[in-house]
């Protein structure tokens, strides 16, 4: 192989490596909160979180969100779907007159330091049995 051809191969490999690196970083840094903000219309915002309007059933919308980014935990209770991500709790369900609302709450808003006892069934482990009142959090000890 000639010297110029080797430079061309090396350059091509460098470009391919850079594209792979950027693609990998992009895929690893998916953020469900940003996805929701860019795909759904914001209905309201308060100190505890942001609400977005959605169409379809809560289960369908939650499944769409799970396809974008897999949550650490998923549970449902009646018509509401709960998705726990590394930094957010996402709740999808009816709210007031709205048949489908997505609520995004940052974990630092209170979940991390025990401000909320019940996050819907299926979120385990529950709070310690020696905690307030001596009973595990949530029904069946799930938190």
Curated annotation (Swiss-Prot):
The chain crosses the membrane at residues 114-134. It is found in: Membrane. It is a single-pass membrane protein. InterPro entries: DUF4247 (IPR025341). The keyword Transmembrane applies. Residues 1-16 form the signal peptide. GO terms for cellular component: extracellular region; membrane. Pfam families: DUF4247. Keywords: Membrane, Signal, Transmembrane, Transmembrane helix. This is Uncharacterized protein Rv2599. It comes from Mycobacterium tuberculosis (strain ATCC 25618 / H37Rv).
């Amino acid at each position: 192989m000639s010297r110029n051809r080797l430079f061309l191969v090396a350059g091509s490999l460098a470009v391919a490596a850079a594209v792979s690196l950027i693609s990998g970083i992009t895929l690893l840094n998916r953020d469900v909160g940003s996805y929701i903000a860019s795909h759904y219309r914001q209905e309201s915002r308060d100190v505890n979180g942001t609400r977005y309007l959605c169409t379809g059933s809560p289960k369908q919308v939650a499944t769409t969100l799970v396809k974008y980014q897999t949550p650490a935990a998923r549970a449902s209770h009646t018509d509401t779907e709960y998705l726990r991500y590394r930094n957010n709790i996402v709740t999808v369900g009816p709210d007031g007159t709205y048949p489908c609302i997505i609520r995004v709450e940052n974990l630092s808003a209170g979940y991390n330091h025990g401000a909320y006892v019940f996050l819907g069934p299926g979120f385990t482990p529950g709070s310690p049995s020696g905690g307030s009142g001596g009973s595990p959090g949530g029904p069946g000890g799930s938190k």
